[in-house]
Amino acid sequence: MRYALGVEYDGSEFQGWQQLGEHGGPSVQASLQAALSSVADAPVQVVCAGRTDAGVHGECQVVHFDSDARREPRGWMLGTTARLPPSIAVRWCVPAADDFHARFSARARRYRYRLLNRQIRPALYRQTLSWERRPLDADAMHGAAQALLGENDFSAFRSVQCQALHARRHLQAIHVQRIGEVVEVQVQANAFLHHMVRNIVGSLILVGTGEQPADWIATLLAGRDRTVAGPTAPPQGLVFIGPLYPAEWHLPAEVTQ
């Protein structure tokens, strides 16, 4: 039987979502599979909606897995969470259709990037906030970011390690706002390239400080040259909010579009 899980995690202590072999360091995937396998009393493999890098967090990562073990969804949720480290929790578990796929059934994915904009670096929230000491104009950043909307070639915001076959993605929404001392960037797309969100944020910061004009983002997009764009923003400010699926899959409302 196939199940879908909603998983929350603090990525600070992990080398990323993906299990990278025996000597690849701790991963969220390996921890989750070990816990599920213990509950099932048999090996369990999971497939996720979107892989995250080292230090990046997940608010509602969605995974699917198959198991012949007879467990109620609540049993999977509570039993798995009890076997996970404190930095990972299963938020919900529901039965899924046999043809549901956490990655390929998703219609969109959402990320949030938050950075503390003040002279003094964060102490209390240093693992979940990035930091920029220079004053940022969030309105200018928001205006510049709108040039990225639509289906475009995002080569200028793609890491050199990216293994995607092409750089075309459909950016459905991007919003920048200031909330007190925090500048927040929320972005939604059909899919993302490796480091795409962090590279966009790194370039928007240069607009926010006034180092670059607002139309620079459009110029970068058209130029498709990663070497002239802004630096990659640090990982700790990034959260994978989660994917969105069509209602036909009958998943919880927070991941249904």
UniProtKB/Swiss-Prot annotation:
Keyword Secreted appears in the UniProt entry: no
Enumerate the active-site residues: 53
Which EC number(s) does the record attach to this protein?
Answer: 5.4.99.12
From the UniProt record, give one GO term of the biological process aspect: tRNA pseudouridine synthesis
Q: Name the UniProt key words of this record, in alphabetical order.
A: Isomerase, tRNA processing
Q: For this protein, what is any one GO molecular function term? A: tRNA pseudouridine(38-40) synthase activity
Locate the residues binding substrate: 111
**Which chemical reaction does it catalyze?**
uridine(38/39/40) in tRNA = pseudouridine(38/39/40) in tRNA
Q: What class of enzyme is it?
A: isomerase
Query: By its UniProt entry, which Pfam families does this protein fall under?
Result: PseudoU_synth_1 (PF01416)
What function does this protein fulfil? Formation of pseudouridine at positions 38, 39 and 40 in the anticodon stem and loop of transfer RNAs.
PANTHER family, per the entry:
PSEUDOURIDYLATE SYNTHASE, TRNA PSEUDOURIDINE SYNTHASE-LIKE 1
Listed HAMAP family: TruA (MF_00171)
- Which proteins does it associate with, and in what oligomeric form? Homodimer.
Report the sequence similarity comment from the record: Belongs to the tRNA pseudouridine synthase TruA family.
Please identify the protein, giving its name as recorded: tRNA pseudouridine synthase A
